[in-house]
Amino acid sequence: MALTFKDIERVANLARLELRPDETEHTLSQLNGFFALVEQMQAVNTDGVEPLAHPAALLGEVALRLREDIASEPNQREASQASAPAVERGLFLVPKVIE
């Protein structure tokens, strides 16, 4: 995937950014470099490769200090929402700020 100068101008316009032509060219170069790197990584065959929890796990002698993913606090939803001005189905309701 390669972006064009027009793509950068369009995204800058949507983001309400004013870029000089040299900034647009620099951004185009950086983003295309990023996409090229992503394409290289996607091309690597990872079939049969076991995912690692942490790169240090490869070393073997390093003990990982990763804790179990267990909730350490009780669900406080009702208590947190007790003082809210508006709640619906467990969610805070806020005024619409974007038209």
Swiss-Prot record:
* UniProt keyword terms in alphabetical order: ATP-binding, Ligase, Nucleotide-binding, Protein biosynthesis
Q: Which reaction does it catalyse?
A: L-glutamyl-tRNA(Gln) + L-glutamine + ATP + H2O = L-glutaminyl-tRNA(Gln) + L-glutamate + ADP + phosphate + H(+); L-aspartyl-tRNA(Asn) + L-glutamine + ATP + H2O = L-asparaginyl-tRNA(Asn) + L-glutamate + ADP + phosphate + 2 H(+)
Q: Which GO terms describe its biological process?
A: glutaminyl-tRNAGln biosynthesis via transamidation; regulation of translational fidelity; translation
The UniProt similarity line reads:
Belongs to the GatC family.
The record's function comment reads: Allows the formation of correctly charged Asn-tRNA(Asn) or Gln-tRNA(Gln) through the transamidation of misacylated Asp-tRNA(Asn) or Glu-tRNA(Gln) in organisms which lack either or both of asparaginyl-tRNA or glutaminyl-tRNA synthetases. The reaction takes place in the presence of glutamine and ATP through an activated phospho-Asp-tRNA(Asn) or phospho-Glu-tRNA(Gln).
PANTHER family referenced in this protein's UniProt entry, alphabetically: GLUTAMYL-TRNA(GLN) AMIDOTRANSFERASE SUBUNIT C, MITOCHONDRIAL
Full protein name: Aspartyl/glutamyl-tRNA(Asn/Gln) amidotransferase subunit C
Q: Which organism is it from?
A: Polaromonas naphthalenivorans (strain CJ2)
